[in-house]
């Protein structure tokens, strides 16, 4: 079933959550409750979706690189909750209390395009990112739709575009260091926008969307209750 959204068209949705109708619940024993996927940076690129043994290989890599975090049960067992503890911009940890992230919980969801953050966290992120972008000489641009409000004009730039690094930090110290395509959403050359958005309220559930997951292998081990991620997988 095709579906349209603000960021384009999808062919359909494959349910991999922990709800009763999910493929992982219906065939979980066959695949040992494990799956992994990688979303490519380029729409024409090749990603993958692995179940069972293939996902176990990804899990071993995530453990070796210390890039895994506990899978939490926050407001029910359906979603894949994780404990986010901080955000770094340019290698510097932003002044955001951990309680801001734990207030409503955070899930990993490949069906959501843009990551949603509590307003208090998003405000610190956009301020730090805009400051670093200004230091690099980029010109600000008007927002693109209501959701993306921190945009820049890249007209006339050639070659590699340098960006401040952005990292999400999780329980256990695991760090998701964004690929460049996970930092900016380029609507067009005059509108390259910070690919994060604020929820309406700090009490709204936060979401790590597919844009921020690009090029990483995301591994889910339901039995061990861990989520792992490995960079440069596709």
What do the predicted segments below correspond to?
Residues 84-103, 198-201:
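A short acidic-Thr-Gly-centered motif at the start of a beta-strand
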Residues 110, 118-121, 170-172, 179-182, ...:
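Active-site proximal loops enriched in glycine and acidic residues that flank catalytic Cys/His/Asp
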Residues 41, 89-91, 168-172:
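Short acidic, glycine-rich loop/turn motifs
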Residues 178-212:
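A conserved acidic, glycine/proline-rich C-terminal tail/linker
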Residues 74-78, 87-90, 211-214, 219-234:
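C-terminal helix/juxtamembrane-tail motif
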């Amino acid at each position: 079933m095709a579906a349209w959204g603000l960021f384009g068209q999808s062919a359909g949705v494959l349910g991999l959550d922990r709800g009763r109708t999910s493929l992982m619940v219906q065939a979980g024993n066959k695949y040992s409750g494990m799956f992994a996927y990688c979303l490519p940076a380029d729409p024409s690129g090749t990603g993958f979706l692995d179940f069972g043994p293939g996902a176990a290989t990804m899990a071993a890599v995530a453990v070796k690189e210390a890039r895994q975090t506990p899978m939490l049960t926050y407001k029910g067992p359906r979603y894949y909750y994780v404990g986010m503890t901080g955000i770094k911009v340019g290698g510097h940890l932003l002044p955001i209390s951990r309680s801001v992230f734990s207030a409503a919980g955070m899930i990993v969801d490949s069906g959501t395009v843009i990551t949603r953050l509590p307003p208090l966290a998003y405000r610190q992120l956009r301020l730090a990112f805009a400051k670093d972008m200004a230091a690099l000489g980029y010109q600000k641009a008007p927002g693109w739709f209501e959701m993306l409000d921190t945009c820049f004009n890249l007209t006339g730039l050639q070659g590699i575009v340098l960006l401040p690094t952005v990292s999400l930090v999780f329980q256990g110290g695991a760090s998701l260091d964004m690929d460049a395509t996970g930092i900016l959403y380029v609507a067009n050359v005059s509108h390259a926008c910070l690919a994060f958005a604020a929820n309406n309220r700090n009490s709204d559930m936060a979401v790590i969307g597919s844009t921020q997951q690009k090029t990483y292998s995301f591994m889910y081990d339901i039995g061990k209750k861990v989520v792992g991620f490995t960079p440069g997988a596709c």
